[in-house]
Swiss-Prot record:
Lineage of origin: Eukaryota, Metazoa, Chordata, Craniata, Vertebrata
InterPro entries membership: NAD(P)-bd_dom_sf, Sc_DH/Rdtase_CS, SDR_fam
The organism of origin for this protein: Bos taurus (Bovine)
UniProt: NAD(+) binding residues: 19, 21, 40-41, 62-63, 89, 154, 158, 187, 189, 191
Alphabetic keyword roster: Carbohydrate metabolism, Cytoplasm, Fucose metabolism, Lipid metabolism, NAD, Oxidoreductase, Steroid metabolism
Family statement: Belongs to the short-chain dehydrogenases/reductases (SDR) family.
Main location: cytoplasm
Complex and partners: Homotetramer.
The protein's name in its UniProt record: L-fucose dehydrogenase
GO molecular function: D-threo-aldose 1-dehydrogenase activity; estradiol 17-beta-dehydrogenase [NAD(P)+] activity
Tissue: Detected in retina.
Biological processes, Gene Ontology terms: L-fucose catabolic process; steroid catabolic process
Length: 270
């Protein structure tokens, strides 16, 4: 693997780094010269990435457990003596469900992972990031801004991640710490494939996901990863930003009502 210098000598923690977007982010930072700590609660996946990529260290960690996260940060500092960037990528998108099918317990569990896991690592990492004038990168989602059918809990958690990013950026600017987020659209990952498989017609679901972008394809984890390295390195005048990596899925003006919705003709005001 060719090693770059864009982020040489820096130390990065990536949560959910065992597969999908997270693994892509780990790879991109390694290629940029950084030392990367892979955080994942799935040991087999994390170890596989560690074996593949020299310059990485895997630490077993469930971001919903604060003691795990404390150990993650302290062990990173013990091994490397510094911390320059955290990428809060760990998260989950449940299968489609209507609001009446959701439970308060399921909603809380998703909040613990998608939102509070991000908050906990950020809080515990900030003393070290302030020393290095480092940065925080949160992985949010396009649907946190534009909504998504049958995904109320997920949309709520990701909208909160984006809002938290902006608030943290204000608080941490006095220490020179930059806080930004990336909001991906449809990125082809194992999780996307699993979600499609849970629908009545996976092939049709994948086709719809592909055609949602004007570019006519889904994104790749490497494209989100490139955005993360950019925010950590060259984007030195960016904080509180939401960087969309969506293939333009949010663009345009089109049909929203379903087939069964009555098509009412507009009336002219009297």
């Amino acid at each position: 693997m060719a090693m770059g210098t864009r982020y040489a000598g820096k130390v990065v923690i990536v949560t959910g780094g065992g597969r999908g977007i997270g693994a892509g982010i780990v790879r991109a930072f390694v290629e940029s010269g950084a030392q990367v700590v892979i955080c994942d609660k799935d040991e087999a996946r994390g170890r596989a990435v560690e074996r593949e990529l020299p310059g990485t260290v895997f630490l077993l960690c469930d971001v919903t457990r604060e003691e795990d996260v404390r150990t993650l940060v302290s062990e990173t500092i013990r091994r490397f003596g510094r911390l320059d960037c955290i990428v809060n990528n760990a998260g989950y998108h449940p299968p489609p469900q209507w609001p009446e099918e959701t439970s308060a317990q399921g909603f809380r569990q998703l909040l613990e992972l998608n939102l509070l896991g991000t908050y906990t690592l950020t809080k515990l990492a900030l003393p070290h990031l302030r020393k290095s004038r480092g940065n925080v990168i949160n992985i949010s989602s396009l649907v946190g801004a534009i909504g998504q059918s049958q995904a109320v809990p997920y949309v709520a958690t990701k909208g909160a991640v984006t809002a938290m990013t902006k608030a943290l950026a204000l608080d941490e600017s006095q220490y020179g710490v930059r806080v930004n987020c990336i909001s991906p659209g449809n990125i082809w990952t194992p999780l996307w494939e699993e979600l499609a498989a849970s629908t009545p017609d996976p092939t049709a679901t994948i086709r719809e996901g592909t055609l949602a972008q004007p570019l006519g394809r889904m994104g790749q984890p490497a494209e989100v990863a490139a955005a993360a390295v950019f925010l950590a390195s060259e984007a030195t005048f960016c904080t509180g930003t939401e960087l969309l990596v969506t293939g333009g899925a949010e663009l345009g003006y089109g049909r929203k009502a379903g087939q069964a919705a009555p098509a009412e003709a507009p009336t002219t005001p009297s």
